[in-house]
Amino acid sequence: MLESRSRKFFAALLAGVVLNPLIGCTAAPTTPVGGSLPGSSAGTPSATTPLGDVPKDSSATLEVSPVPFDGQTVVVATFSSAVAGRPVSLQKRSGDGWQEVALSEQDKKGQAEFHTDTAKASYRAVALEVAKDGKDLNALATPSASAAAQWKQVFSDDFSGSTLGRPFRVRSAGQYYAPRYCAASQPSMVKLDNGILSLGVAEVGAGRAKQVRENVARITGTAASKACPDGVYDNAMIGTQGKYLVTYGTVAARMKFPAQRGMHAAAWMQTSDGTDVEIDFMESFGFGSRQGMQNMLHPKGPNNERLDVGANVKNVPGIATREWWDQYHVVSMEWSPDGYVFRVDGVETYRTSKALSKRPHFLVLSLQTSDYETNRLDPSQLPASFDVDWIRVWQRP
């Protein structure tokens, strides 16, 4: 087991009261960064230490996320030797030396995660010296890494124009079909103003609602008087189908989700023929709803049925409060040949290697009212909107 002296040493580092002989500087007092994960902290940088003073773990990796989580960068170090609780120092290159910017601990998989407010930097992580089972484990450093070296931005839309521009366009305009016989995407529900894309939901007028109900009655055999009992709605959906496709990479968007229930906002991806895995990197059903927010994958089953692989988002600070829904949040999904990693505001919310797609997908942003959920919709709270500040894609160079 990890001996207690290393724990005390780590606590002393956090307090800024000991000299660390392995990185050659006195650790500065640290304070948690807003929104950072437990166990990760950052504060006033320590003094620099010369390059190359710590032996490298040649099998270790250091991943620097390209996503700007509202001023924070996520860095994940993975060491070849897993020692749960082992203190790890994240350092950025500063001139000819290294400057400590955060402290964390290894988990049982040998990983240590950091949130730091220093975005454009070259980093390394140092697993500090500890004693385990009566043996000293020497300090080891990961290879250095930076987001600029690991990622290249290949797509960006900040919705700065007055109208929707390529490659996004309205999808399925005016089309009513299951599971939305009583709602359809409409161009009028897509608006841009001051760099914000707003996707809306609104109840339609009596005249058009009557036409929709008559159409539903013809399709389903239901009496028109009983069709769409919860109302008829205009929805919004845009996508890059036929214009932009991506296979693997990191997709992120800064968004504000509607708090109203009876509808769902989604940032998702689909193949052009719709036969492969649908990737819902964020789907939101409103404040207080049973589904809440989800990271979800929808592969096809043996009989072409739609399956669900994913999880509800529960571990993001503040998500259970009403105020959270009035703010913008950055949602990301990293998709690689090894699997998917989902994050909200930099917090990992779901990770899986299941339902892994290898095919190109296009991007979709939508706010929809499906027939199965409109019984929870309160028309007095309409119109509602799903607001998007930007959406970006990065890939490995």
Per-region residue spans from a language model:
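Low-complexity, Ser/Thr/Pro-rich intrinsically disordered linker/stalk segments at domain junctions
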Residues: L2, A11, G16, N20, ...
